[in-house]
Amino acid sequence: MASVVVKTIWQSKEIHEAGDTPTGVESCSQLVPEAPRRVTSRAKGIPKKKKAVSFHGVEPQMSHQPMHWCLNLKRSSACTNVSLLNLAAMEPTDSTGTDSTVEDLSGQLTLAGPPASPTLPWDPDDADITEILSGVNSGLVRAKDSITSLKEKTNRVNQHVQSLQSECSVLSENLERRRQEAEELEGYCIQLKENCWKVTRSVEDAEIKTNVLKQNSALLEEKLRYLQQQLQDETPRRQEAELQEPEEKQEPEEKQEPEEKQKPEAGLSWNSLGPAATSQGCPGPPGSPDKPSRPHGLVPAGWGMGPRAGEGPYVSEQELQKLFTGIEELRREVSSLTARWHQEEGAVQEALRLLGGLGGRVDGFLGQWERAQREQAQTARDLQELRGRADELCTMVERSAVSVASLRSELEGLGPLKPILEEFGRQFQNSRRGPDLSMNLDRSHQGNCARCASQGSQLSTESLQQLLDRALTSLVDEVKQRGLTPACPSCQRLHKKILELERQALAKHVRAEALSSTLRLAQDEALRAKNLLLTDKMKPEEKMATLDHLHLKMCSLHDHLSNLPLEGSTGTMGGGSSAGTPPKQGGSAPEQ
């Protein structure tokens, strides 16, 4: 028979994997490698109460399902002073922490697995122990599923944050592209202004040239009128000269001398008539006084010389034709210049219209660019706030992961609970067959009432509520401080998701609290039953009464575990604490 060592698991680091050992041999240093000094103090004197890890959320499972120890829960930040006790079958090889314990124990009990014989001392389908174990397993499996769903939701939130960051980068690229387009438009506007200035200068030059051409055409028209008047004055004199020619041919001899005398007189008379004719006609322009002298010199040649009488009109007609052709060319040039000026004026008007439209577009674009700048600044602020919230969420998830890991390592040490409960069931079935079951019920109650009362006082609803308030104060403050509504819809959706994750984390925390208290109570009851069964000093009648009392306690604990909900709330904490309160049928009277 291997000796039984009672140990206390003080911290989460001291909880290690401890399964069913068929040989029942395991040293104390293997169970608790990190706390040898605490084991020594445990063996020497009264143990000091220290903080242990608490769990929450137990729901019974069907009796036909297999019992697996899938202990994977979220660790609670609040701790109680109830020690989490662990039992394992081991031989008395440890001389430091187990000698005193083994000496105190007068009886020995083999904690190996169930016997290989098919005939068991109890019913394998017993409703009490099987449903308790199945309920514990079901609660642990559900807690594991809830933690897995929380991790999946956290991954989805991270993916959404990454998509928002990609959208913000695309928006920044679009704003940079718009800024480049604005710079190109500014350069194009400057070029258009330069072109308009050049067109304006060319239009002014064209107007100056047109005015000069108009002045030249007016001068030419005045000269043409002057020449026409001279021709009109010259026509009657030419007719008189033609009539006088036959008379001069008939009397050449008689009038030679008078003709020679008349030539200078005629020249003098023409010279005297020339200025008179010029004074009678329209005066020429002041800038060309030499033009009327040309017909003034031609008329006396035709007047005084007979053979050259027809040269004067012929030369004047050629000059008139040249003048007319020059005037026509001038008119065509003026008309072409006018048409060109009209075209340039139309181009200038079109350019001005385009400039007006472009100015409106530039104003609109500047307004859009300013709005885009404001939106970019707002987006940058929202992105910064979103990054802060994402960092906080990542920190919270990391803390949750660390808590889950530590909780998993702690729950892996609860493996010995299964053989303890099985052994307790066997002993209970064997002990119920005794004859004196109800003789010393009150005396057995008096032996354990003080401890039950202490357990009930430690696991009261008020203490659990205080622990929960203390643990959740920081989280509630963070939620209240960050309860501001974000600006953009995406940030609002992300904020809602973060709040939902926080609520779920709070619910998981409360469920873990209730489950931890329930598991602690179950382990305490199992340890108490183990100690009672190992005591040889107790009489058989007292053993039977004590076992009956423990049976009643286990039934009440099973009822509380069956009624324990898995939804995280304050009422659940109260239910978990009420489940942990032992019944005060026989132990409350001596305590009072």
UniProtKB/Swiss-Prot annotation:
Comp. bias intervals (Polar residues): 269-281
Region of interest (Disordered), residue spans: 232-308, 566-592
Biased composition (Basic and acidic residues): 234-264
GO cellular component: centriole; cytoplasm
Tissue localization of expression: Highly expressed in testis. Expressed at low levels in prostate, female breast, placenta, ovary and thymus.
Intracellular or extracellular location(s): Cytoplasm, Cytoskeleton, Microtubule organizing center, Centrosome, Centriole
Impact noted for substituting residue 19 to R: In a colorectal cancer sample; somatic mutation
The entry's keywords: Cytoplasm, Cytoskeleton, Phosphoprotein
InterPro entries linked to this entry: TSKS (IPR028214)
Phosphoserine modified-residue sites: 217, 288, 316
Coiled coil feature spans: none
A Pfam cross-reference name: TSKS
Source organism superkingdom: Eukaryota
An MF annotation (GO) of this entry: protein kinase binding
Post-translational modification: Phosphorylated on serine residue(s) by STK22A/TSSK1 and STK22B/TSSK2.
Purpose: May play a role in testicular physiology, most probably in the process of spermatogenesis or spermatid development.
Name of the protein in its database record: Testis-specific serine kinase substrate
Species: Homo sapiens
